Amino acid sequence: MLKIKLEKTTFENAKAECSLVFIVNKDFSHAWVKNKELLETFKYEGEGVFLDQENKILYAGVKEDDVHLLRESACLAVRTLKKLAFKSVKVGVYTCGTHSKDNALLENLKALFLGLKLGLYEYDTFKSNKKESVLKEAIVALELHKPCEKTCANSLEKSAKEALKYAEIMTESLNIVRDLVNTPPMIGTPVYMAEVAQKVAKENHLEIHVYDEKFLEEKKMNAFLAVNKASLGVNPPRLIHLVYKPKKAKKKIALVGKGLTYDCGGLSLKPADYMVTMKADKGGGSAVIGLLNVLAKLGVEAEVHGIIGATENMIGPAAYKPDDILISKEGKSIEVRNTDAEGRLVLADCLSYAQDLNPDVIVDFATLTGACVVGLGEFTSAIMGHNEELKNLFETSGLESGELLAKLPFNRHLKKLIESKIADVCNISSSRYGGAITAGLFLNEFIRDEFKDKWLHIDIAGPAYVEKEWDVNSFGASGAGVRACTAFVEELLKKA
């Protein structure tokens, strides 16, 4: 991980092997830009990166005056620098976006530091010849690249320290999630997932309970159990329950995650091409583990419960079947018409378990539907639920964190598509349309009336795992949901 060192000095006086200078909104006028003739010769107009080898300066373009583009550009710059031979880089402080906001400086620093730190991530566990980055340190000169109000300058050091703490915690947590999601299925089993959760619990002094199939049977979590039937003798299920309890808690929050460590579709077998990347079906459960790490280290004033349903969905003689009828923990019967709609079965029982804790807010995370990716693209998560205020808060705070989110509305017509003639509800829609919403409506069937306005469903199927670099995310797992939910919890507690 890149070490960031704060120094109370000017950018010119800071010492490092190379310099990183951002060109914000194609503005070449500030003093840190050197050798403008060279930039003009090579027609560098402030987009992408450009290396001035003579002066050892890497220029990185920030296309617009936008804090999210600053974060992305910082990440791109580090990705470029790690291919070079510099051990250290110096950078100043930039302010982008809405300068009138009270926390504008802090948010810019968070974005800068997080972008720098995430730029070094690469999942290379199984590479024979690992290429370790020479770049080890970023020196941040506590000098603003352009004048601002005196109050802004006076708060620079304090804001920088707070932002650095956030960036270090968030980077560590995102990388825990990324590593877990990227772990191949022969290693990343339900038991392995529980072991990762136990490490996080131990480090943060969290309470943790890991339950096996016997507990699931006792609690009548039959929908969850059914999904695991083909794997029971080899990779049994685990219900993981993490608990963070601060001395002072304004809210009790339950975070629920789908932890499908591998999903071949069960007897409703996926085509071969669609099985590839299904190690990422544990993205929701992994995000919950990462969130407990973030929220505990930040010391938020909320009692937080992280509940993960970890299992495989495989084929075998004991596998559950289309036409099965399952009795869930809530007592509702489920007609199974497609065994590849399994994540919602696991979540149904886990959400029931979460409601028994009587939380003030419930948020579930799942790589639930391909339909969500079709509708919103691979970079955007969907928000569903009944409480407009809660949905709006998650969307606005999540967007400010740098994640992309959009609300999808429930409606009575789509609800009819999951009706069953022989059970209380069907696990698959009778129509090919609106699949992300009908999956959310299925989960809604297991939310008790008193919790309807306390529950949010986040479908992270698109951004949880993308096979290319984008924004601050490397090839593979991104840690989708972690930044957004952290911001949501912080804003929720401000209103408490």
From Swiss-Prot:
Belongs to the peptidase M17 family. One of its GO terms (biological process) is proteolysis. It comes from Helicobacter pylori (strain G27). It catalyses: Release of an N-terminal amino acid, Xaa-|-Yaa-, in which Xaa is preferably Leu, but may be other amino acids including Pro although not Arg or Lys, and Yaa may be Pro. Amino acid amides and methyl esters are also readily hydrolyzed, but rates on arylamides are exceedingly low; Release of an N-terminal amino acid, preferentially leucine, but not glutamic or aspartic acids. Signal peptide: none annotated. GO terms for cellular component: cytoplasm. This is Probable cytosol aminopeptidase. It holds the Pfam family Peptidase_M17_N. PANTHER family: CYTOSOL AMINOPEPTIDASE, LEUCINE AMINOPEPTIDASE-RELATED. Its EC number is 3.4.11.1, 3.4.11.10. Its cofactor is Mn(2+). SUPFAM superfamilies: Macro domain-like, Zn-dependent exopeptidases. GO terms for molecular function: manganese ion binding; metalloaminopeptidase activity. Binds 2 manganese ions per subunit. Presumably involved in the processing and regular turnover of intracellular proteins. Catalyzes the removal of unsubstituted N-terminal amino acids from various peptides. Mn(2+) 2 binds at K258, D263, D281, E342.
